């Protein structure tokens, strides 16, 4: 697997209750009042509901929520997330020494606890921890999750953001907003997660925070303004100026653990005032109170500015921007202060779910972050631990106690919480109970990611908003070198359960096990983990693109399945039409007069689902088809569910092949960054692949090209890029869309498929 390919659907999903189209979902849980609830569309509407809920909270609940922050650290790969998190843990006293990524000191960053993570210098799994931060003589509790930057491991970001209340978005001061930054921004919007932004690597040559802020405004389309100005830059970075209260902050001590406050340097005073005015002007555009002050020509106080930043940030209308260097131990502590000042506490976030009614309809309900309400929790992540399956749970309502029983909503089973722990990367600390808003883990519970648990004895059947799971874009065959099928099967089952984007199926025709995922790196990591964790060496086939099949014009069908071989035969006739649609696949019936009984129509729907999994052209999944059955015929003796299911198979194939079918291939958004002297070589390489260049940005030393290329053309691109740039170029891929293949490619794919099918007979 030479190249590192990464892909994910660019589907925007509103947070609370809509389920994504053409994607897998996980049902979760929610619980509260019985009255009908209207879903809010904006944060202002959410806040009305939040304020009502907060009126019912007890002082102890409010106090606990005020001191709690659930935050994630997200960014493009190599922006310094894990290095930043390591400093956070050190400055909060959670670890006693700083260790670097890649395990250069034989230890490695605390949050990258897998050997593979430390060897490769990347985060593969999200890691959870907790720490405390003191500000203004008050102690605040942070639940912190460090997430991967590789698009291949995007599900780790999805499930982290699903349960977090806020985030720190880390942006590289040199590279600025990159492809995965845009993806992470979209994921934050999907789950309505507010963020503060930290511009990292200010000590690097070419660092330009103002360009990065312009890109945040332009590319991420969220108002952003600096609340700091750097003191020095690149190798001369000394500290930052807090422009809100006009104070210079210097990191001192061997590892920057001490903050010294001083007056603003004389040569920066003009810039500080300029950026302060820009901050106030930006806030006036997104906050009514600041707008009133601004229009009246008054000078806002420090408290008024901070209040406006907090309201606008929590309202997801603005992101404050801080800057520094995690590696150089500069500017980290002010970010922790900003987490306290500007990111929401649990009772400032509206968590909504669905309660199943007796008529099978679903009613939206809101959760209360109170320990006195019935328990509701979401299992958002699974890991294989030394004591069995480790299940991470976010407590949305009530409290969870060691030794207590809770109900698994999906199965209705009662399970006992035999052990309750807080996680610190791969270490754990036993606790007796956790309250609303907290994140914990427990052992010995049989469940899947996204399952909901409620307190024992609770009558409501409740599911929370769904977690978005992107479709796989790449597959390969895999088999153990030896006959150790037991360990191999155990590994497959475990990894599927832990990672919803890792798919496994057995191809009965080729007699092969096929694994599918988000990219070559994604699958490569799992092949390596099977070897390391289960002692099973595997042989893998060449990576295969996950094509799709679709139709382009409507097509009518009239198909009769008739089989007679003595005794009762098989008979089923279905009539209708097939149409191309842009949304999810759809099956519909409009039968008048009961010509086809309901049980046979149900069999038809199952037949339709069968056909979607394996299209008539090359055996790949079908996309964007609407099948309507509006007439048909039965036989009093020979008609059966099997007959109508088989008839649907025949009708589907008949209509599909008559509807000018096409083969769709994944088109990837490719971003290549390399030194300027290699620009011609890189552009030529992309053109050779048949790619379409959309944008080129030239920096002082490097350039970045954004293009669209077919995934099929990208195999081996890593090697080609390395050769074209003397090993100095890097690239990332993200799934963009499905697009029809060229006619000659479609013809070749069909011929190869037909040849392979004939060889099996």
Curated annotation (Swiss-Prot):
Cellular localization per UniProt: Mitochondrion
UniProt domain tr-type G: residue ranges: 66-347
CDD domains from the UniProt entry: EF-G, EFG_III, EFG_mtEFG1_IV, mtEFG1_II_like
Broad class of the protein's primary localization: mitochondrion
Signal peptide per UniProt: none
Pathway this chain belongs to: Protein biosynthesis; polypeptide chain elongation
Residues annotated to bind GTP: 75-82, 146-150, 200-203
One family name in Pfam for this protein: EFG_III
Family per record: Belongs to the TRAFAC class translation factor GTPase superfamily. Classic translation factor GTPase family. EF-G/EF-2 subfamily.
Protein name: Elongation factor G, mitochondrial
Organism lineage: Eukaryota, Fungi, Dikarya, Ascomycota, Saccharomycotina
Gene name of this polypeptide: MEF1
């Amino acid at each position: 697997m030479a190249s590192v390919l990464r892909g994910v659907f660019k589907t925007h999903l509103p947070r609370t209750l809509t389920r994504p189209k053409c994607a897998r979902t996980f049902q979760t849980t929610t619980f509260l009042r019985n009255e009908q609830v209207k879903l809010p569309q904006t944060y202002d509407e959410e806040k009305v509901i939040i304020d009502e809920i907060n009126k019912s909270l007890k002082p102890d609940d409010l106090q606990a929520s005020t001191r709690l922050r659930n935050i994630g650290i997200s960014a493009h790969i190599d922006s310094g997330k894990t290095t930043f998190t390591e400093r956070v843990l050190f400055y909060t006293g959670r670890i006693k020494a700083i260790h670097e990524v890649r395990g250069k000191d034989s230890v490695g960053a605390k949050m990258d606890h897998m050997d593979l993570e430390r060897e490769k210098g990347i985060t593969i799994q999200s890691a959870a921890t907790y720490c405390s931060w003191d500000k203004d003589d008050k102690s605040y509790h942070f639940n912190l999750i460090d997430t991967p930057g590789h698009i291949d491991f995007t599900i780790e970001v999805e499930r982290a953001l699903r349960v977090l209340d806020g985030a720190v978005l880390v942006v590289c001061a040199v590279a600025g907003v990159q492809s995965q930054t845009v993806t992470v921004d979209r994921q934050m919007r999907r789950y309505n997660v507010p963020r503060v932004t930290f511009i990292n690597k200010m000590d690097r040559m070419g660092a330009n925070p103002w360009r990065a802020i312009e890109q945040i405004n332009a590319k991420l389309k969220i108002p952003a303004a600096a609340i700091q100005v750097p003191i020095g830059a690149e190798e001369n970075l000394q500290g930052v100026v807090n422009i809100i209260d006009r104070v210079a902050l210097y990191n001192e001590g061997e590892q920057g653990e001490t903050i010294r406050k001083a007056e603003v340097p004389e040569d920066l005073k003009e810039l500080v005032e300029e950026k302060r005015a820009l901050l106030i002007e930006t806030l006036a555009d997104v906050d009514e109170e600041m707008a009133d002050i601004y229009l009246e020509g008054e000078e806002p106080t420090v408290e008024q500015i901070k209040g406006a930043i907090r309201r606008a940030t929590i309202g997801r209308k603005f992101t404050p921007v801080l800057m520094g260097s995690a590696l150089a131990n500069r500017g980290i502590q002010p970010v922790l202060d900003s987490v306290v000042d500007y990111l929401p506490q649990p009772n400032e976030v509206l968590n909504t779910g669905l309660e199943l009614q007796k008529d099978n309809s679903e009613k939206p309900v809101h959760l209360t972050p109170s320990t006195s309400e019935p328990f509701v929790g979401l299992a958002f992540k699974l890991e294989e631990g030394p004591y069995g399956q480790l299940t991470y749970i976010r407590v949305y309502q009530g409290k969870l106690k060691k030794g207590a029983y809770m109900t698994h909503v999906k199965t209705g089973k009662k399970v006992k919480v035999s052990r309750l722990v807080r996680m610190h990367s791969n270490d754990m600390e036993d606790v007796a109970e956790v309250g609303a808003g907290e994140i914990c883990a427990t052992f010995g519970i049989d469940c899947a990611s996204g399952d909901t648990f409620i307190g024992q004895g609770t009558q409501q059947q409740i599911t929370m908003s769904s977690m978005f799971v992107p479709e796989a874009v790449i597959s390969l065959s895999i088999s153990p070198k030896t006959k150790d099928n037991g360990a191999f099967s155990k590994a497959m089952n475990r990894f599927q359960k832990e990672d919803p984007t890792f798919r496994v199926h057995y191809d009965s025709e080729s007699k092969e096990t096929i694994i599918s995922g988000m990219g070559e790196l994604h699958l490569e990591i799992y092949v390596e983990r099977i070897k390391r964790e289960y002692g099973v060496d595997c042989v893998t086939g060449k990576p295969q693109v996950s094509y799709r099949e679709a139709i382009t014009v409507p097509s009518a069908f009239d198909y009769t399945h008739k089989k007679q071989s003595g005794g009762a035969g098989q008979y089923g006739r279905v009539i209708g039409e097939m149409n191309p649609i842009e949304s999810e696949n759809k099956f519909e019936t409009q039968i008048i007069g009961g010509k086809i009984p309901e049980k046979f129509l149900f069999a038809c729907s199952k037949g339709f689902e069968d056909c979607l999994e394996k299209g008539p052209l090359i055996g790949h999944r079908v996309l964007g088809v609407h099948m309507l059955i509006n007439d048909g015929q039965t036989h009093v003796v020979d008609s059966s569910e099997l007959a109508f299911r088989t008839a649907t198979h025949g009708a589907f194939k008949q209509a599909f092949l008559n509807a000018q079918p096409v083969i769709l291939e994944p088109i990837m958004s490719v971003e290549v960054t390399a030194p300027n002297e290699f620009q011609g070589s890189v552009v030529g390489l992309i053109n050779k692949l048949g790619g379409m260049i959309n944008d080129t940005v030239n920096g002082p030393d490097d350039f970045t090209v954004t293009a669209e290329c077919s995934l099929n053309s990208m195999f081996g691109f890593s090697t080609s890029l390395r050769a074209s740039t003397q090993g100095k170029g890097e690239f990332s891929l993200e799934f963009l869309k499905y697009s029809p293949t060229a006619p000659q490619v479609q013809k070749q794919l069909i011929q190869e498929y037909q040849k392979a099918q004939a060889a099996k007979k």
